[in-house]
Structure formats: C-alpha cells, structure tokens
Amino acid sequence: MDVIKEIRTRYFQALKGLTYQGVEIPIFVGFLDGSASLPTIDRGEVYIVIQDQQAYDSATQPYCTYNVTSDITIRVISKFTKKGTTDVVEDIAMEVDNRIRGTIKKRDENVIGVGKIRLSVNRLLVENSDTHTSYSKVLIYQNDLYLTNN
C-alpha cells in the first residue's frame, strides 16, 4: 500500500468543502492550477495547496504491525495585488488544523491507522514582488502510521 497516497487522500477529504466567510476555499495537490478560478476574500485570492510529502520507517517495529512516519505539508495562501493582512490565512489555518485533528485519526478497515498527528512546523511566510504580496501559513504534519496485514 502506498501510504503517501493514502494520507494525501485522507487530508484532501478532511479539507474538502472548507469555507471561510461563506466562501469555499479551493484545494490543490502539488501546485496551483494556473487556469483555476480563485475566490477573493478581503481583497486577496485564497487557496490551499497540499504539498511535499515523505514517508520513512519508524524506529520501533512491533511484531503485529508495520510502523511508518509520514510527513505532509499544507500551505494556506492569500495573494494580494498590494499589501494585505495575515488574518485570512491564520484563520483558515486554524480551521485546517481543527479538521485534520478531528478526522484523520480514523482507522481504515484495519489496513492503515494513525497513531499520532503532530504539527511539527507552523510558519508564516511573506513573499513580495513589485506587484503582489503573498501571505502563506505553512503547516507540516507528522503522522505516525501503523499498517496491519489482513
């Protein structure tokens, strides 16, 4: 089983339908689709990207399960034509965290389970160009997974 694909799917499902101020926030996997229509909230285009992932064997391997650690990056972005505010990305990131912690720790038919979810990085980035300012809330989650053989 590809644990990276499974975890990415679970995160996508947990975030799907997320709204802020009555506006649904689009979610992209890997990168922003340049042809996508982005919603505007408080003058900024807003979206979420599920980015980098990695998986590696856990140091502890009990007899009845196979343990893996999987990291995944969620980036909440708001892009403004001029200067904007970090409020939107910070509020949306809080809702992202609530959804992740509330829905990901579910066992999938005794095949893959999530023991712990840790928010290992919570970072605010500001990027500027001559014409735009972008605010990103970067959330990196570390998932302790266990796989059983059925």
Language-model segments: which ranges?
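Acidic-leaning, charged glycine-interspersed low-complexity segments
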Residues: G44-V46, D97-T148
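Intrinsic-disorder/low-complexity loop/linker signature
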Residues: G22, Q61, K83-T86, E109, ...
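Extracellular/virion structural assembly segments
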Residues: Y63-T69, I77-T103
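Oligomerization/assembly interface segments of phage tail-like spikes and tubes
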Residues: Y66-K82, S134-Y146
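Short capping loops/turns at secondary-structure boundaries
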Residues: I4, T85, V89, D130-S134
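Small/polar-rich, solvent-exposed N-terminal microdomains that initiate assembly or binding
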Residues: M1-C64, T103, R107-V111
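Short, cysteine-centered beta-strand-loop-beta hairpins and adjacent loop/turn segments enriched
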Residues: A55-Q61, I77-G84, Y146-N150
